[in-house]
A protein has these predicted regions:
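Short amphipathic alpha-helices and their capping loops
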Residues: 3, 54-88, 111-155, 180-182, ...
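Extended, hydrophobic beta-loop-alpha segments that form or line the acyl/peptidyl-thioester binding
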Residues: 28, 121, 125, 216-217, ...
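Active-site-proximal acidic secondary-structure segment that organizes catalysis
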Residues: 38-40, 45, 49, 184-238, ...
Length: 505
């Protein structure tokens, strides 16, 4: 039993552990703490102490106050550049955050609204230069931001909309170089009837999916109400300076040390057919895509309501059980992509705020799905309580450059990403519209993309679930350097088998 599970089991009985003067204290109902509990606390005292110290450090990091200072790359941005920069930047795909939407306003109004948002967020105007002293951040002026225009008003209305969305996608697929003049670009397409489509493309190094939703909502607010309605967050730079200072201090060292020890204790999973170690590497990445139609998505949501959990947890458990059966391993780690916007003060922060939590998975053969899910839920809650804000490309304790060598191995075999896609406004509109997925088959048609040569680190397995409310786009990635084509086939089959067992047709 992990320490996280031990503490969760105690808390379920009302027994709360804490630290006072670096000594373990507990609060509990009368006679709740048994002699067996006390013996376990004594036997695992060192582990419990480390857990509680790390929990306190993570809590302190979540509450750190913004720190004013010079414009500086965040630790996350430095680690992103170490992953995505270099001569092969932009290959085979540009790593951008596309922000595209249709607006019931003309092109000049949307252009002005986009300009206002760009001026509001320094994080979208930052650029970088590399030198002997490391990576430097510089700020472009809001007045120098140029927004491209394309007039499609000569086309029939539906043709104009389809053309605009296609060209917006092409626009957002162009690489925004890390050391380019601008890492954010924008374009507005004028449509018949006084409408338009706006497209903003930011390099992932300066933005994330959460940033996308904030920006789209603010453009709508400016157009409809004259100004953003959301309470502004502090600047991304002030937030990241405070984070950097904290991680360099003693509590930051506690977090780094805890996760280094955790990582060193993790097993190295192996592929089932040839025993290849499931390590991150450079080479061929295979991608398989499919769509979950609305009727099936509704069943997932109903299952979540029945168990009083989120769809996120159901998908994570399906992925974990499939990985356990496929690898014939009951215990292993997974990285789960997350968001550092965990407080009201951070909820409207634009910038690189995504991170990846490391989660212990226990999925015993033959165990009931709900039992496995509850265990994963407890371990995920533990990971959040002990969060170190790292990116999934590196071992979890590598929160900033210099902690390990650049080629330090990443042996966490799988990454999971569940994204509730779109703003609340967008999801409501899609849900209220006609079901465009009614004719889609289930089980789905799986589309395998041509092999992609990735110069950057790839995870052995990576499952993306993009839930739009009315349908979900799913993308399953394999690093072929350690997951052979037969193993890719067997894992895909196992994933659909577990899904069918969990969410009956």
């Amino acid at each position: 039993m992990t320490i996280g599970m031990l503490i969760a089991a105690l808390e379920s009985r009302g027994i709360i552990l804490s630290l006072a003067d670096d000594e373990i204290r507990y609060r509990s109902p009368k006679d709740a703490l048994t002699e067996a509990d006390k013996a376990q606390l004594r036997a695992r005292r060192a582990e419990i102490l480390d857990h509680l110290r790390t929990r306190n450090a993570a809590k302190a990091l979540r509450g750190v106050a913004p720190l004013a200072g010079p414009l500086t790359p965040s630790v996350g941005q430095e680690m992103w550049r170490a992953f995505a920069g270099g001569a092969q930047e932009g290959h085979p795909v540009a790593l951008n955050i596309p922000m595209v939407d249709r607006f019931r306003h003309d092109a000049s109004s949307v252009t002005a609204a986009i300009s206002q948002v760009i001026a509001r967020y320094d994080a979208l105007r930052v650029r970088f230069e590399a030198g002997e002293g490391g990576l430097r951040a510089l700020l472009n002026s809001a007045g120098s931001f140029a927004i491209e225009q394309e007039d499609l008003r000569h086309l029939a209305p539906q043709d104009a909309i389809e053309t605009a969305f296609r060209r917006a996608q092409e626009f957002c697929a162009q690489v925004n170089l890390i050391e380019g003049e601008w890492l954010t670009r924008a374009k507005v397409f004028a449509l018949p009837g006084g409408e338009s489509i706006g497209a903003i493309s930011s390099a992932h190094m300066i933005a994330d999916a959460g940033s996308r939703n904030i920006v789209i909502d603010e453009i709508h607010d400016i157009l409809e109400y004259g100004a953003p309605r959301a309470v502004p967050a502090s600047s991304y730079n002030d937030y990241s300076l405070a984070e950097r200072e904290f991680l360099a201090g003693p509590q930051g060292q506690q977090l780094i040390g805890h996760w280094r020890s955790w990582y060193q204790a993790q097993p190295t999973l192996r592929a089932p057919s040839d025993g290849a170690p499931l390590l991150w590497g450079n080479g061929i990445r295979m991608v398989r895509n499919f769509t979950i139609p609305g009727r099936v998505l509704d069943k997932v949501h109903s299952r979540a309501e029945e168990w009083k959990v989120t769809p996120f947890l159901i998908y994570l458990t399906i992925f974990s059980v499939a990985l356990a059966r496929w690898s014939k391993s009951e215990h292993f780690p997974i990285r789960v992509l997350g968001d550092k916007r965990t407080s009201l003060e951070l909820s409207n922060m634009v910038g690189l705020m995504f991170c990846a939590d490391a989660v212990d998975i226990a999925a015993p053969a033959g165990a009931d799905f709900e039992r496995v899910m509850r265990g994963i839920q407890a371990e995920y809650d533990t990971a959040l309580a002990l969060r170190i804000p790292t990116l999934h490309f590196w071992a979890p304790h590598c929160v900033r450059p210099g902690i390990e060598a650049p080629d330090h191995p990443n042996k966490i075999p799988a990454v999971f990403n569940y994204y509730s896609m779109g703003t609340a406004r967008e999801r409501a509109e899609k849900k209220a519209g006609p079901d465009a997925t009614a004719a889609l088959p289930w089980p789905p048609d799986v589309v395998t993309l041509p092999p992609q040569q990735w110069p950057r680190r790839s995870s052995p397995l990576f499952l993306h679930v993009m839930d739009k409310g009315n349908e979900a786009f799913v993308s399953l990635h394999f690093y072929q350097g350690c997951v052979s084509p037969p193993d890719q086939d067997s894992f895909t089959a196992q994933l659909f088998q577990v899904f069918a067992e969990t969410v009956p047709a």
